[in-house]
Amino acid sequence: MEFRFNMHPLFRARIVRINNSLLPTGFVAQSRRVALDATAQISEIINTIGSMSAQAQGLSVPVTTAQKLRNSDHHIYLMFESNDRNGLVVGILKVGRKSLYVFDPSGETVNVTAPCVLDFYVHESRQRGGLGRELFEHMLREENIQPDELAIDRPSEKLLGFLQKHYGLSKKIPQMNNFVVYEGFFASKAQNSTDIDGRRMHITASPNTNLFGPTFTTTEERRRSTSQTRTNVAPMPIIAQPPVGRYAAKRPTCSMAQVNHYSSMVGKISFPEENTGNGKRSVFEEQELDQRLADEMERCVELGAGGDEPDASRYTPHHGLEVKFADQPETLPYDDMPEPGPDPDPYDFHPHHLELHDDTEGGGSHRDQSLSPQSVSQQASPVHPAGSDYGVLGSRKPARYTKQNTGLKNISFGVGAAVMPSGKMEFDQEENEGFGSVKINRPIGKSGTRGSLHDDNESVHSNGSQQGGGGHFDLKFYHNKLW
């Protein structure tokens, strides 16, 4: 495969070996910039050849990339073919050591670290020309290994045929993974049998095998577990260290014992010990003790429920803590309380209640006299007959119907008569009395018409005035012209 850059400076030999430094062995860079350029070029070559190898084997993900090589201790062998231009890369072989769990010929699981062939590819235009065998032989010489010592990772049919044709490897040992090993894989390691025996795995016969899978133990571990010559090692003394931090904080005591209100009282009940001669109570003594305990429990319950009359002095409040207000009425005992009298008649306010009579002149109308709102409100309040039978407490003032009792919270009783013009009283205001003067009056210039309401006064009518005579006016409409 040809690339866009000149590869002759990178390949000083026909086959070069590349490690995780991404530089060919024996490559000497003149400067740091040259080394970085060489690394970038080798990375491009490895990525391109790895993609072509994965495509030829039918793999979805390339096995060989520059990033994977940088993060591992594997090696890549690249075969180069020079020409008059930039040169050609015709083959790649990736090898490395891996720790594998494989089955030996007897069926036992062995953990070995063996050299593996991870990727092998020769360009289609150079196949069946001996280039693959040349590359493979060079790798065997560099790694100093034999073909039967190799574990092949996911070999294709072409690779299996290549190994059988050139090295006579045909007898495979079935494995539980994707690696293929041959019979010579374990025979070549017979001289180092102690290392293999030490790492030979055995499946333990445990009842948890069906649940959690088989458990593997090595021969050395089994030998140590079954050995009788082991000396019992004294266990290390346990040193209790005091807790520190939040673990040393005091815990709150449990309050479950206080749930039962009588647990403290019952716990204090004690009975004299009446033992027989042999140190044990008789049946009659046990029954008597149970009866006494039940009686004591019943007495405690009666005390808690208020069955016995407690001492009145215990519940008498201290006189120094009693507080009595000045306007607080004097309370009478329940037996000395008089019967409540009949309820007072409901008071209805009407404008004609405000008619004032002159005692000196014989009852003439006070049209010329001034009437203040205070006097109107005083006359509008109902007067109840005095007597001790009114109400429960004699010293209580007579009840009045307030705005809260009648539901008319926005209605003023004493102002209704002053606002509403009638034949009994009139207010004429012809001149402006200045800022801050508040008077309730009809519009200026309408003093001649009596008993009629102007349109300007309609906005101050409350809902109660729509029911007929004696309506009230709401004084909260400050935007009205009257204010």
UniProtKB/Swiss-Prot annotation:
InterPro entries in the cross-refs: Acyl_CoA_acyltransferase, Atat, GNAT_ATAT
N-acetyltransferase domain: residues covered: 1-186
Record-level GO BP terms: microtubule cytoskeleton organization; neuron development; regulation of microtubule cytoskeleton organization
Catalytic activity annotation: L-lysyl-[alpha-tubulin] + acetyl-CoA = N(6)-acetyl-L-lysyl-[alpha-tubulin] + CoA + H(+)
Biased composition (Basic and acidic residues): 347-369
Disordered, as annotated region: 204-231, 330-395, 437-472
EC code(s) of this entry: 2.3.1.108
Site (Crucial for catalytic activity): Q57
Class of the enzyme per the UniProt entry, highest EC level: transferase
Acyltransferase among keywords: yes
Molecular function per GO: tubulin N-acetyltransferase activity
PROSITE patterns recorded: GNAT_ATAT
Coiled-coil annotated residue ranges, if any: none
Keyword field: Acyltransferase, Transferase
Domain of life: Eukaryota
Residues reported to bind acetyl-CoA: 120-133, 156-165
One Gene Ontology CC term in the entry: microtubule
Biased composition (Low complexity): 370-383
Keyword Acyltransferase belongs to the record: yes
PANTHER family, per database record: ALPHA-TUBULIN N-ACETYLTRANSFERASE 1
Function: Specifically acetylates 'Lys-40' in alpha-tubulin on the lumenal side of microtubules. Promotes microtubule destabilization and accelerates microtubule dynamics; this activity may be independent of acetylation activity. Acetylates alpha-tubulin with a slow enzymatic rate, due to a catalytic site that is not optimized for acetyl transfer. Enters the microtubule through each end and diffuses quickly throughout the lumen of microtubules.
Family listed: Belongs to the acetyltransferase ATAT1 family.
Listed name of the protein: Alpha-tubulin N-acetyltransferase
Organism name: Anopheles gambiae (African malaria mosquito)
